[in-house]
């Protein structure tokens, strides 16, 4: 026989269970959300291109690009780890999945867009000509016909030299080697990005007495962060940070630190 008391006991037990479940759900809903760990992005850079990216006396990778991307990471809610990578293999590395992105003074070009994706531009830096101060006649690249002009291999500087018939291109693995050759009179001039030219010709004690910048930038070039073709998620994350840095004017302080 099923007695009434048994029914009441069952009802009370069920009611207690329902209340406990409700309290647990309410507690979970009101608990502070645990923040997701920031996404960490491994970024390749050829740290031989001061003041944009280089290794300092303490063996740290520093420079304009490094500070800019750190600021973008902070604004965009992600973290970055930098990996020093030689320029001649840097683009192949991203295809092979050795890292997630590249920030290394990479000029955005239509040709490069065919095989890789770029973030929003983060700085405009055109090519410019650096010559010895004793050179009183050179005003532009075309004036150097019959002479050797140096640039880093695979850069837009090297591409610009090739456009000038009669000017002999000499390429280098590192831009600093080109300036060393010019100091030793082995080449007549160097073509490089304006920020790099400013560093070597205007800031470095060993060169600023002997080198000068001539003319004005003869290209308009925008640097972007490179990601593997089709990686839209990472591109959106990077662009979010870049836009925040620029809209807040944080890039101005970074430019003042490295480019003035």
Locations of regions flagged by a protein language model:
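Periplasmic-binding protein-like
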Residues: 47, 123-131, 194, 198, ...
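Ligand-binding clefts/hinges and TM-proximal coupling segments of bilobed small-molecule sensing domains
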Residues: 36, 156-172, 209-214, 239-260
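A ligand-binding cleft/hinge motif common to bilobed small-molecule-binding domains
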Residues: 92, 104-114, 160-163, 188-219
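Extended ligand-binding regions for polar small-molecule ligands
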Residues: 66-75, 135, 148, 153-155, ...
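Flexible hinge/capping segments at coil-to-helix
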Residues: 35, 132-148
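Short helices/loops that flank or line small-molecule/ion binding pockets
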Residues: 74-75, 83-84, 88-101, 115-117, ...
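Short helix-initiation/N-cap motifs at beta->coil->alpha
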Residues: 66, 81-92, 136, 153-156, ...
């Amino acid at each position: 026989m099923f007695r009434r008391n048994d029914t009441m006991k069952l009802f009370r037990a069920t009611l207690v269970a329902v209340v406990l479940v409700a309290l647990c759900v309410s507690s979970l809903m009101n608990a502070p959300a645990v923040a997701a760990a920031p996404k960490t992005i491994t970024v390749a850079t050829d740290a031989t291109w001061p003041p944009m990216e280089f290794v300092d006396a303490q063996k740290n990778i520093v420079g304009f690009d490094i500070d800019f991307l750190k600021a973008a990471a902070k604004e965009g809610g992600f973290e970055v780890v930098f990996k020093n990578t030689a320029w001649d293999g840097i683009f192949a590395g991203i295809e092979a999945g050795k890292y997630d992105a590249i920030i290394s003074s990479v000029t955005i070009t239509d040709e490069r867009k065919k095989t890789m994706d770029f973030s929003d531009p983060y700085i405009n830096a055109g090519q410019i000509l650096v010559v010895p101060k004793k050179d009183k006649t050179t005003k532009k690249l075309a004036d150097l016909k019959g002479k050797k002009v140096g640039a880093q291999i695979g850069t837009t500087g090297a591409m610009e030299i090739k456009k000038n018939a009669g000017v002999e291109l000499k390429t280098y693995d590192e831009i600093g080697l080109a300036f060393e050759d010019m100091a030793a009179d082995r080449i007549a001039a160097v073509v490089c990005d304006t920020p790099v030219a400013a560093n070597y010709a205007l800031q470095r004690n060993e060169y600023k007495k002997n080198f000068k910048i001539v003319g004005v930038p003869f290209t308009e070039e925008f640097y972007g962060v490179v990601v593997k073709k089709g990686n839209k998620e990472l591109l959106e994350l990077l662009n979010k940070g870049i836009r925040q840095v620029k809209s807040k004017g944080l890039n101005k302080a970074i430019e003042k630190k490295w480019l003035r």
